[in-house]
Amino acid sequence: MSIKLGYLFKLPSYKTSSISPEVIVDLEKFLNLCEGSCSQCNTPFCVDVGPRNAIIQLPNGADVLNLNPNFQAIFECCSKNSLTGVQIFGMYNDGTYELRSFCPVHGVNEDPANGSGAGSVGVFFALNNPSIISSDFAHLLFNQGKILGRNALIRVAIKLSANGLYDIHVGGGSKICISGTAEI
């Protein structure tokens, strides 16, 4: 078995849109959070990279791990608001992040390693912290999947491109579990 490290893909172009205050309150309720919790750090908004995700930042990684989501209610909220899922993250004291990805609309209550979701969080981070991002890559490290017993480390690299938008690269380690060819 071999392990490959590195950036696996560059996120495609992205679009952002706001989330109504009513939907934010609903998401707080469905995540079993106190009202106002989702806006403590930054106002949540949607990032669309193909999948359209609501992005929420909590004050710390432990808050993210302690979430007790109501998946049926999240499913209904996402369906009603054309969301693929909800990405929730928080920073630890060591500068790494905890990320949880809820996508019940697609039959995945919680994804242990969601690259497009982590990339969407990278967009959210860059737009909320423009002074940190330059033409050199800023790096974020996300822990994901702990609650599911499937620990993953996802790396997100962000840089400001010449056109004023952010280039987001997502990757991490992977194990080749099977190899071969397929004929179509």
From Swiss-Prot:
Single GO MF descriptor: isomerase activity
Keywords noted in UniProt: Cytoplasm, Isomerase, Nucleus
Keyword Cytoplasm recorded: yes
Entry GO terms, CC: cytoplasm; cytosol; nucleus
Subcellular location: Cytoplasm; Nucleus
UniProt-listed GO biological process terms: biosynthetic process
InterPro entries tied to this protein: Phenazine_PhzF-like
Coiled-coil region(s): none
Gene3D superfamilies registered for this protein in UniProt: Diaminopimelate Epimerase, Chain A, domain 1
EC number: 5.1.-.-
Further remarks about this protein from its record: Sequence homology predicts an N-terminally extended version of this protein. However, this extension introduces 2 frameshifts, making it unlikely that this gene is correctly translated or that there are errors in the genomic sequence.
Assigned protein family: Belongs to the PhzF family.
Record's protein name: Uncharacterized isomerase C186.06
